[in-house]
């Protein structure tokens, strides 16, 4: 009896501690008042009632169907292999009439882990069910000693259906203060303890199984919490904080238990709608990258990237006709004899020296004299009238050209190699290189243009001033040539004059050997879709119009050949090709790329060729920042505002210029090499690369122009590259093998040498030498001797870069580029794959092309 009192006293202390913790975790509820109706008036009785209520809250909740088994506390059942069932170990372990079990620590852990997740309302119902279980245990206590199998009522141990189907009204007939010191319970617990100690192995297995169930239960609960959190909110950390803190969360859990929705006990955060608000999405923190180098036109940031901001030509920014949206103002600039045009014409003449377009025309000794003659012609009204210049390119020629190029490659793919294309009854050889820029359709166009040019020049010489009628007759011939063809319709803009197609004349930007270069501008229309074919200031599109006239004494055939070759090569390179699926023996092209995959960003677009009288007009893409020569020799004296103050740009001596920053020069070099490689892939070598033939857009996009002296080293009917002989281009950029008499050379290697000279000009601000002949140039002679004796050149060794590694890689590439023996010289493709170029960050992202030209 003393032992029973001591055990009861110990249980009361434990009940007080647990009841106090429950009172701190749960708020008082109105329902809880009804649970104390049958409680005794004595203080120990109340504590004992609380102790039993606490035990029931912790252990008996598994019998409630409203609680999900995933979130239920872990029950400490007997090992499965034992033949006797254990009625309720977790519940009996709190009884004062038994000794503490071996797993009491695990029981306390289970109780304290989940006690905060129960509700008082549910506890009242569970208390009544527990009283019913106590009564049933008394009735079955007699059968325990006979070792009859006891089947527990709850579902985890295969409970009886009769117990679970009993009406809830019968719970009222059972006393709520049933003591735990019942002799039947004491005997049952004694037998249970004896059976639990039946085997040490069984107890160890039971202990491990209990830990595993607890660990799995916690894992499933955490996983379900994360799943619910993702369903109700995009992410828990991103949800706005709750006003009531944890109180709101606990109240939600309490309400969910009371409503029988146990699956929502572990909700975190507030409920949200199915739609996601933009305010709940994570905001991208735009970190402004620090600029570590600012040269005005070139900026370098700390992440290694750079930005070009080249200055737009003053003829665009300062011209009133450009800013004005009235076409009458632009039209007034055409008639130079008007009184209101004197100031505009004077302004244009002052701006001519800003943009060097000598690359568009070959330099000659009488350039200044011809420019004066052109100005005199403009003053006398003898300049080409753009309103009477019409295109001599048949509108259906290029539509048919696209179809022929498509069929050309399809015939190769289908094995129709024996089919020969015919042109006006003449057989054309078999196509073996569909990637070539010059093919059957280009050949037909060359023949047609040559015939028209010759006819126009001869008729002008014989008829005198009847050029206007001849131009109109050509227009009628082109119209008759395209009419009546099946599946073709006349384009609305094909026979419009130059002023209607490309706008009004606004000024002159340069002069050359065969004429001048003017700028035309027109307002944008709905048909102009991005990307534009030329420069735009947002309101208007600008076009460069190159006027070509034969010089006195020039042969017609020579002028005709230059004009047609320049236009055909430029037009073919600057427009998309359609031979995409060609499969050639030993040379696999690409596999179904987009049709415009061949369109190169570094090739100046040639748009149209027009004619008026004995003059011709080539319409091109306009580059608003001028050429590389103008960039290197930018303005001898100029004032630029810098935060309200003016700074004077250093005066540049004649023959030298301001070198570019190494990173800027590297970017331009990479663009130049990609453009030249694109030409080589299509069987064309430029043969006259120099700063005057390299144009720029304000964002730093490089454009290669002037294809008048370009060499077609491989056509569509040639399998191998054919060499050429004779010096071509400007002397400072000509390779040494070109000066060898009667010697043939590879034009692709000549372009590589010229690219190296152009790069050295960018970083040095001057030429390496005037001519690559040792007898005529002492600097080139010293270069040869130093390379032969020391294996290095002092100018290359004095070059500096932003890092020693880049400087070392650049020197290696330069020495390989300036190999006097062309057989040892690096190619453009190899130079692009060098470590120097791979480490160079370029503004243009290039799609890798795998087209190759047969060697």
Swiss-Prot record:
Annotated keywords: ATP-binding, Kinase, Nucleotide-binding, Phosphoprotein, Serine/threonine-protein kinase, Transferase
Source species, domain of life: Eukaryota
Protein kinase domain location: 503-837
SMART domains named among the record's database cross-references: S_TKc
Pfam family, one: Pkinase
Signal peptide: none
Sections of the chain in a coiled coil: none
Sequence positions that bind ATP: 509-517, 546
Compositionally biased residues, Low complexity: 57-74, 248-258
GO molecular function, one term: protein serine/threonine kinase activity
Active site positions: 688 (proton acceptor)
Modified residues (Phosphoserine): 17, 19, 68, 72, 160, 273, 277, 324, 333, 336, 358, 391, 395
Biological processes, Gene Ontology terms: intracellular monoatomic cation homeostasis
Biased composition regions of type Basic and acidic residues, renumbered to the chain: 125-139
Cited function: Protein kinase involved in salt tolerance and pH sensitivity, probably by regulating plasma membrane potential and cation influx. Positively controls the TRK1-TRK2 potassium transport system in response to potassium starvation. Stabilizes TRK1 in the plasma membrane by preventing its vacuolar sorting and degradation. Also stabilizes other plasma membrane nutrient transporters like CAN1, FUR4 and HXT1. May itself be subject to regulation by ARL1.
PANTHER family: SERINE/THREONINE KINASE (PTHR24343), SERINE_THREONINE-PROTEIN KINASE HAL5-RELATED (PTHR24343:SF43)
Name listed for the protein in its UniProt record: Serine/threonine-protein kinase HAL5
